[in-house]
Regions:
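Cytoplasmic juxtamembrane interface segments
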Residues: 31-40, 104-111, 185-188, 192-199
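Select transmembrane alpha-helical segments in multipass membrane proteins
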Residues: 45-58, 94-97, 160-174
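Membrane-water interface regions at transmembrane-helix termini and the short interhelical loops
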Residues: 25-28, 51, 97-123, 187-190
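Glycine-centered flexibility sites
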Residues: 2, 34-35, 45, 49, ...
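Extracellular loop-to-transmembrane helix junctions
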Residues: 1-91, 205-211, 215
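Central hydrophobic cores of alpha-helical transmembrane segments in multi-pass inner-membrane proteins
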Residues: 12-24, 98-107, 181-182
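Helix-loop-helix junctions that connect adjacent transmembrane segments
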Residues: 5-9, 80-90, 119-236
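Hydrophobic membrane-targeting signal helices
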Residues: 22, 75, 106-109, 132-136, ...
């Protein structure tokens, strides 16, 4: 999609906001930690509920394996161990260890999980916000790479994308990166004011995500340029 990546980010936000809003109202009526499984079963019958529940489980397994691979690889890269980062067995081992750590935190209890999430998410958001400020500053001050380009409002225009297939593919990928806000509703039975708080948190999360994704995508392609990002797609 070229320079229209920020447009893809806000377009993908629209269906996510609608789904989050539906979760809000469903949770108000029936705050059940089974979420999709429970609600679909009550509305459409056990078959639809079963399919919905298993679809989430299968997706979780695929995503967990993918994220474990990323965590394993970048753990080595963080310490400059490039050789180990290119070894799938070492990466798999560290990825499994990360899964074990997360499983233990979940076993300890929801409060430990919440505290760890506050720390990790806070560090992530602060880092991304700093990048979103520093990168454009370097572009306008002339200290960015030669491939850099100055931001433009046209980047937010989805109609600048000539190919319908590229637009569709971009939205599908962008929807995937919004993954995770629904976990807020899955802990509704362990939340104060369970009829309201999880749903509000879900909607707020999608709004925060679209803000972060749009400004970071603008900053990244402004600093490095779209061609550089395409050539190094595995790293971004």
């Amino acid at each position: 999609v070229g320079l229209a990546a920020p447009a893809i980010m806000w377009l993908a936000f629209v269906p996510m906001l609608l789904v989050a809003t539906s979760y809000y109202y469903l949770n108000r009526v029936d705050p059940d930690c089974g979420t999709t499984f429970s609600w679909a079963t009550k509305a459409f019958g056990p078959w639809v509920g079963w399919i919905g529940g298993w679809a989430i489980i299968v997706a979780d397994i695929i995503v967990m394996a993918n994220l474990a691979d990323i965590a394993g690889r970048y753990t080595f890269l963080l310490f400059g161990l490039d050789e180990q980062a290119d070894n799938k067995y070492w990466v798999m081992l560290i990825g499994v260890l990360w899964i074990a750590v997360m499983t233990y935190i979940c076993y300890v209890g929801i409060e430990a999980s919440a505290r760890s999430q506050w720390f990790l998410l806070g560090a992530e958001l602060v880092t991304l916000l700093i990048f979103a400020v520093v990168a454009p500053y370097k572009v306008y001050s002339g200290n960015a790479p030669e491939t850099s380009v100055k931001p433009s409002l046209e980047w937010l225009n989805p109609f600048s994308i000539d190919s319908t297939s590229s637009l569709t593919a971009g939205i599908l990928v962008a929807i995937f990166i919004y993954w995770g806000w629904d976990s807020l509703v899955s802990v509704n039975e362990e939340t104060e004011d369970k009829e309201r708080t999880p749903g509000v948190a879900a909607i707020a999360s999608t709004i925060i995500l679209v803000f972060i994704y749009v400004i970071v995508s603008i900053a990244a392609q402004a600093y490095a340029g779209p061609d550089f990002l395409v050539d190094n797609a595995d790293d971004v």
